[in-house]
Amino acid sequence: KGEQKTLKVTVHPGNAYVRTITYATSNSSVVTVSRTGKITAKAPGLVKITVTADGGKKIKNTIQVYVRDKKTGTSNAPLSGSSGTILHRGLSLEAPENTLPAFSLAGQKGAKYVETDVRQLKDGTFVIFHDSNLLRMCGVDKRIENLTYQEVKKYPVITGTNASAYKNNIIPTLEQYLQCCNKYSMTPVIEIKSNLDQNGVAKFNQIIKKSRKSPVVISFKEEPLIMLRQINRTVSIQWILRDQITSAALNECARYKFDVSAQYGCTNRATIARAHSKNIKVALWLFTDSRIADCYKNWGTDYLTCERMM
C-alpha cells in the first residue's frame, strides 16, 4: 500500500507502429494507473490492469496486481482461517495427475481435500480420469468412455510428473480413489465429467456412500447435479461456472441447494459476500501463487483449489 511502480511495455517487432497505449484498472479504490502506466497502490486487494496497444488493430494484455497492507501484510479483511485448500488432481506436481501415487502423496503431506475427475466407461465402471481421450496421459488415441475397464487397464499412465518412477500406473477406479481418501482421512472432491443418465447418477450415488468423509461433488454439467440432489438431499454439491458468478447463477444454486465454483479471476470480494448472503459457499480455482490465495482467503472464500499445499 502506498507504493508506486511504472509498467514497462515492450513492442514486438521493434519497428511495429503503435499509435496509442492506454491503461485501465478494474478497481481504482485499490490501484490507480496513470496515462503513462504508473500504478499506485491505494488499499489492500487484488486488481487487474489492462494494457491496450492501438496501431490500427487493438491488442490487449492483462496483469494482476496484488496489494498488501504495509503493517499487517494482509488485505483489510480479517483472516477467517476457515478456507479449505483443495489439491487439484492430487499432488500432481510430484506424481502424474489423478493417479493413486498422486493421491497417496497428497495424503502423506496432510491434505484435507483432494480433487479428482470421474468418467463412466462402456461397462458402467467409474474411473478417475480428466480427459475424454487417453492420448495425453497414456499415449494412445482412444476415447476412454468407449472402453471397458479391462481394456483401460491395458494402457497405464506414462506421462506426467515423475511418470517414469511409477511403472504400470493403472488408471484407478472411483472406489480405489475413495479407499485412498479413507486411508488418509481426506475429503473427496469429485468432478463429474460424463453426461450421466439417471441410472448412472444412481450408481455414482451408491459408490460415494463408501467415503468416510462426506464428499463434495462438482461439475460444469448442471443436469447430473440436479438428478443427484433429487436422490441425495445432504451431499455437498458445487456447480462450476465458466464465467462470472451472476445473480441468475446464484438463484439457481439457491433453488437446488448448490454451492458455487468459479475461476478466481472472475470473482471479487463483493461477489463472495453476495453468495454468502444467500447461504451459498464459494469455491475458487486454480491458485498457483500463495499471495493471491491469501487475499481470497481474507475475503472469505470457502474453498481454494491449488496445485500445491498452501
Which residues does each predicted region cover?
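Extracytoplasmic soluble-region selector
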Residues: 1-74
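Phosphate-group recognition and catalysis centered on beta-loop-alpha active-site segments
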Residues: 48, 68-310
